[in-house]
Design a protein with these regions (language model features):
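General nucleic-acid-binding
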Residues: 1-24
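Short alpha-helical segments that sit at the start of domains
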Residues: 27-53
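Short, cationic-aromatic polyanion-contact patches
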Residues: 42-49, 65, 98-121
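Short amphipathic alpha-helical interface segments
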Residues: 50-62
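Short acidic, hydrophobic short linear motifs in intrinsically disordered regions
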Residues: 63-71
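Basic amphipathic alpha-helical segments that dock to polyanions
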Residues: 69, 84-91
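A short, conserved structural fragment
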Residues: 91-98
Length: 121
């Protein structure tokens, strides 16, 4: 099961996590792969949180096109394309090009089964 961890960390904290993991690898300790998206500014994190319903709709309904997703979420296609592009840039979703009913369509796809938030107080 692939789990995505979403967190708010500074660049220094991410680097420390990387060093800790590199030391474990050098010692030969194998861990389960960890997929994490860390935000270093609150604006991007808030944008992610605001658009969780879109991510959830992609995971649950597995739409065959952006247009179908727009109908499911009751959002404008142009606004939805911006959200999808944001998610794709941070690596949360992949957009595949597929042929549906004779037309080339963009199909958003989430590769994770679960999204977890890890927030420090």
């Amino acid at each position: 099961m692939k789990r995505l961890i979403v967190s708010c960390k500074t660049a220094d904290q991410v680097f420390e996590d990387f060093k800790r993991t590199a030391k474990k690898v050098q010692r030969g300790v194998r861990q389960e792969p960890q997929y994490e998206v860390s935000f270093d500014n609150k604006a991007d994190f808030n944008r992610f949180v605001r658009n969780i319903p879109v991510l959830s709709a992609i995971m649950v309904f597995k739409p065959r096109s952006v247009y179908e997703l727009a109908k499911l979420t009751h959002q404008d296609v142009s606004n939805l394309n911006k959200v999808i592009q944001f998610f794709e840039e941070i690596g949360v979703i992949r957009v595949k090009t597929a042929r549906h009913a004779g037309r080339m369509v963009k199909q958003p796809h989430v590769e994770y089964n679960e999204v977890t938030f890890r927030l420090a107080a």
